[in-house]
A protein has these predicted regions:
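N-terminal active-site segment of His-dependent metallophosphoesterases
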Residues: 2-139, 144
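Active-site-proximal beta-strand elements of phosphoester/diester hydrolases
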Residues: 75-91, 197-209, 223-229, 298-306, ...
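Extended active-site neighborhood of metal-dependent phosphoesterases/phosphodiesterases
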Residues: 58-70, 131-219, 273-300, 320
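Binuclear metal-dependent phosphoesterase catalytic core
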Residues: 2, 34, 41, 45-66, ...
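Active-site glycine-centered loops adjacent to acidic/histidine catalytic or metal-binding residues
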Residues: 83, 124-125, 164-165, 228, ...
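Active-site-proximal segments of metal-dependent phosphoesterases and phosphodiesterases across multiple
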Residues: 220-256, 260-284
């Protein structure tokens, strides 16, 4: 009790001394700031740069959920990258391309280090202008893409790529054989892939194609369908055919730049449930969920948000799926990303303050200049 009283009185005395000190409360402090604003602005600018360019990325893991799938069961780790859409040379400036590439690279490297994935799945729209690019432009975009995501550091069977409408056409541009073959040349044409009790099957809703695989799944295996465009988003004939033939346990898709969970029927292709995935109050409001194997004729589809800040979305993230291969339980989490636009606006605000201070100082300097009066002397 005595120690608490001494601590309380000591803190009170310190704050009283601090805020009644002449330097802090007198006009001399404000006068010093008024006469030397650039010292203050330099300190604030340095702190702003350190936060925006280093701390915002270095401390990302502190805000991410703990990734786990049990202590005693083997775990397969998958990292999903949706709609990176590296900017093109037609619509964007060199600075915009450089800043967006840098953002994608830094956030991806932190996410990869945190998730330690066995497999990385790129869910399409790898390039923003891939469908419109000439051969020379495409080669430059490809080199940038490989550098951003450090593709040379991965094993060939560690990455899976899906084409999006911005890669081969399909939404605003026509799909051509040249575009499709160019994509296959650089990113592969494998349509199904197996890894440790997990089967990945690629579905292309734009080309309306999917591989011919046995309907009967292997015992204790999970079947994942990967599609750039959601299959349960807008029900149609193709979705019905694909779901009825493939009978997946889970669908992972992108394209909408949103984080959504859908539930549908594999026989009819119709959606029966929709839920935004932003935070989970049962997991301490962290973006983390647990999905169990679906019941018969039911499928879960998870739409993964974009990882680029240039896609018009305020919610960017990478996604992870930690799969318990013995119980077939999926621990799904979102690795949310900082708002780069907010960082850029903070720079704009800071430079605006600097400009206003310069104007005020200039006007103040003019006001302090001595006024010279001329007196006319008569000569008699």
């Amino acid at each position: 009790m005595v120690s608490k009283l001494l601590l309380k009185n000591g803190c009170y005395f310190l704050f009283k001394k601090l805020f009644t000190n002449r330097f802090f409360c007198s006009k001399s402090c404000l006068l010093w700031i008024w006469l030397n604003p650039w010292y203050v602005l330099f300190s604030l600018g340095f702190a702003l740069i350190v936060f925006n360019e280093w701390m915002a990325y270095a401390f990302l893991p502190l805000r991410w959920p703990t990734l786990k799938c049990g202590h005693t069961h083997p775990c397969l780790k998958v990292l999903f990258v949706a709609d990176p859409q590296i900017l093109g040379e037609i619509d964007e400036t060199a600075f915009a391309r450089w800043d967006c590439d840098r953002y994608l690279h830094r956030t991806f490297m932190v996410a990869k280090s945190y998730a330690e994935p066995d497999i990385i799945v790129f869910l399409g729209d790898l390039m923003d202008e891939g469908s419109r690019a000439t051969a020379a432009e495409y080669e430059r975009y490809l080199a940038r893409f490989k550098k951003i995501f450090s593709l040379s550091s991965f094993q060939p069977n560690q990455t899976i790529f899906l084409p999006g409408d911005n890669d081969i056409g399909g939404e605003d541009e026509p799909i051509t054989k040249i575009k499709v073959e160019r994509y296959k040349k650089h990113f592969g044409s494998i349509t199904d892939f197996s890894y440790s009790h997990l089967e990945f099957i690629k579905v292309n809703k734009m080309l309306r194609t999917y591989p011919d695989v046995p309907q009967e799944k292997k015992e204790n295996w999970l079947r994942f369908v990967l599609s750039h465009i959601p299959l349960l988003g807008i029900p149609g004939t193709f979705s019905y055919e694909a779901l009825n033939e493939l009978k997946p346990d889970f669908i992972f898709s992108a394209h909408d730049h949103k984080s959504v969970h859908l539930v549908g029927n594999t026989k009819t292709g119709e959606r029966s449930f929709i839920q935004p995935l932003v935070s989970n109050r049962f997991a301490g409001h962290h973006p983390s969920w647990i999905f169990f194997p679906p019941s018969r004729d039911t499928v879960n589809e998870i739409i993964i948000p974009t990882c680029s800040y240039r896609m018009g979305s305020n919610f960017m993230a990478y996604a992870t799926a930690y799969i318990d291969t013995q119980r077939n339980v999926i621990h799904y989490s979102l690795l949310t990303l900082p708002s780069r636009l907010l960082h850029l606006f903070s720079y704009l605000f800071f430079f605006t303050i600097c400009f206003l201070v310069s104007i005020i100082q200039y006007l103040s300097h003019l006001c302090r200049q001595p006024q010279i009066k001329y007196v006319q002397i008569r000569s008699d």
